[in-house]
Amino acid sequence: MPTINQLVRKGRRDKTAKVKTAALKGSPQRRGVCTRVYTTTPKKPNSALRKVARVRLTSSVEVTAYIPGEGHNLQEHSMVLVRGGRVKDLPGVRYKIIRGSLDTQGVKGRKQARSRYGAKKEKS
């Protein structure tokens, strides 16, 4: 507990909020190159093979990014656009790849929430 005199001299310091997407360096998205594309298993109550990619960003930081949607065309050396947003059941995965931009194709046959997955409107 500081004294009144100490508060007069120094004042109180505001707590700084922790940045959750440090690798983006304040940008909304970052471009990157896939260094490894693989599957991993989620945390305890869930069971699946989640598709993830190790991405080297233009900010020269290497991050693990989730590939959303069913099926993808990514492989090593693919150019991708990465945004923030964690995957709750994958520890250490704090970024997502944006579908339908750069080398990443949109999800085929997607009818709902198409803009999130880069899917074009189907001709009826």
UniProtKB/Swiss-Prot annotation:
Similarity section: Belongs to the universal ribosomal protein uS12 family.
Domain of life: Bacteria
Classification via Pfam families: Ribosom_S12_S23
Entry's transmembrane regions: none
Role summary: With S4 and S5 plays an important role in translational accuracy.
GO biological process: translation
HAMAP family referenced in this protein's UniProt entry, alphabetically: Ribosomal_uS12_B (MF_00403_B)
Compositionally biased region (Basic residues): 108-118
Annotated protein name in UniProt: Small ribosomal subunit protein uS12
Source taxonomy: Bacteria, Bacillati, Actinomycetota, Actinomycetes, Mycobacteriales
